[in-house]
């Protein structure tokens, strides 16, 4: 799990727990298009991700960057994320809802531990 920070319409931060995949030097998320975090990213793509090592809370990775959003209507990416977390993302979506793949393009990466 990671914590995603986005900025709301009023400029205040919103924090959300999200599933992620790290692959090909990228961090990608699968998000439901009806959620506030997606609306925030469409308005302001700047975001931060914090990935905390649950076995050692003094070890973490912070990524600050911009979100690039691409449609995932067939759940091709969502299914890969779901496999990592042993869950089906469709179980979290209501009928008619769709998903996007969000790639965080880093401007700054900070690690500790």
List each language-model region with its residue ranges.
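Short beta-strand segments
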Residues: 1-32, 41, 47-51, 62
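Extended aliphatic helical segments
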Residues: 18, 27, 38, 81, ...
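Structured soluble/peripheral alpha/beta segments that form catalytic or ligand/cofactor-binding pockets
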Residues: 35
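A short, polar/proline- and glycine-enriched secondary-structure boundary/capping micro-motif
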Residues: 38-44, 60, 87
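Charged, gly/pro-rich active-site loop segments
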Residues: 54-113
